[in-house]
């Protein structure tokens, strides 16, 4: 993303003046899927794709915002109760309101922003937008008195209160706390976190986007949560201390098998194994063992496909193709039923894999997948 591109549009739209420039990244999650609402671990990292915004206080109580990518302009008063109709402007409005709730004296400003986080590919473009404006508001109007953790919560509260999305905190957390060359293991129960080195020399991290989103996603997601809760309730009969599947071992699950439906058992088995895989991948990274990391990614895909049943034909096809091409690791990334696979690919296999993925996928499904190379990068920051 080019600062000068954003600056030129800002100057053109706002009478030749310039302001401060801020950026926040999108994110990937290397492993740890459907573990967040089970009290487990996730393992995200910020990426080199995100949002850049230029912002200048305008001495009024009105925010004047221009989306460069959408060529759309919105104005709103900071004391207005109703959020703007434009969905993208709701994120900025929500962040301003949430910062004000936390005691930051947000004033009116002019802003233009653009992004290179692909929409709908599971890299959290909305979290990048929220983090950009939360960080900027804190810097411009709050003397940076709001800590990073609270900035992530500002983004999450914006989703809940202004955008109707009941999300966890992983996306915003990764966007704010991202660090170049490191992934972040986040404990979704305690919210404690730890950085682990991720600098795979000789490998590339690449997302292959199936460009499909099956309609089942939201109802199926709710059913999976209910399955996990049912399994926990069954285990609690003998182990009342259990709060989440994170507290359950496979032995405990087996012990309660008679009280759990076959489907709920499969769902719980996947989650228990996935939480352990996150820990195994962290251990492997500390040893620089990327082969084990890749193996665990394949295990996750198998679990999401066969036990949690949130994959789809397109994603299974891409995963099988990656394995056949000798790709070190591959799995579906995100909630499932479409979206991307995330792949850990040796440099020397990269061109062959991408060419084959595009050709074979198009032959079978009649359209080409999109491909995104990503590098693990820094979180929200001021650029100029």
Regions inferred by a protein language model and the residue ranges of each:
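Short Gly/aromatic-enriched secondary-structure transition segments
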Residues: 39-46, 224-225
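C-terminal nucleotide
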Residues: 1-27, 52-85, 182-329, 344-384
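Short, charge-rich binding segments
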Residues: 44-46, 54-57, 102-103
């Amino acid at each position: 993303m080019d600062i000068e591109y954003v600056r030129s549009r800002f100057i053109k739209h706002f009478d030749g003046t310039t302001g401060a420039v801020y950026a926040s990244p999108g994110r990937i999650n290397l492993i740890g899927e459907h573990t967040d609402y089970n009290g487990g671990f996730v393992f995200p990292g910020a990426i080199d794709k995100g949002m850049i915004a230029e912002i200048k206080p305008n001495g009024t109580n009105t925010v004047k915002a221009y989306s460069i990518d959408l060529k759309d302009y919105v104005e709103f008063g900071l004391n207005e109760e109703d959020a703007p109709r434009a969905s993208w402007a709701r994120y900025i409005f929500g962040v301003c309101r949430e910062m004000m709730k936390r005691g930051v004296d947000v004033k009116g400003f002019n802003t233009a922003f653009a992004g290179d986080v692909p929409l709908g590919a599971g890299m959290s473009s909305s979290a990048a937008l929220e983090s950009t404006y939360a960080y900027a508001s804190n810097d411009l109007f709050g003397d940076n008195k709001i800590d990073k953790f609270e900035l992530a919560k500002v983004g999450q509260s914006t989703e809940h209160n202004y955008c109707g999305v009941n999300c966890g905190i992983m996306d915003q957390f990764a966007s704010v706390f991202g660090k170049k060359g490191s992934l972040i293991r986040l404990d979704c129960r305690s919210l404690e976190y730890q950085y682990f080195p991720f600098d795979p020399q000789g490998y590339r991290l690449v997302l292959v986007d199936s460009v499909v989103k099956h309609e089942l996603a939201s109802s199926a997601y709710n059913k999976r949560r209910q399955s996990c809760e049912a399994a926990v309730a069954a285990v609690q009969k003998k182990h009342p201390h259990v709060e989440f599947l994170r507290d359950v071992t496979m032995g405990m699950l087996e012990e309660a098998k008679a009280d759990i439906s076959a489907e709920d058992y499969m769902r719980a088995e996947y989650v228990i194994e996935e939480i352990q895989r996150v820990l195994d991948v962290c251990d492997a990274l500390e040893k620089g063992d990327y082969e084990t990391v890749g193996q665990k990614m394949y295990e996750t895909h198998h679990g999401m496909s066969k036990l949690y049943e949130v994959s789809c034909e397109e994603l299974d096809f891409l995963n099988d193709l990656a394995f056949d091409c000798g790709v070190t690791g591959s799995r579906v990334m995100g909630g499932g039923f479409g979206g991307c696979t995330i792949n850990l690919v040796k440099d020397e296999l990269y061109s062959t894999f991408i060419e084959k993925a595009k050709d074979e996928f198009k032959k079978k499904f009649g359209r080409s997948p999109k491909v995104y190379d990503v590098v693990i990068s820094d979180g929200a920051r001021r650029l100029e």
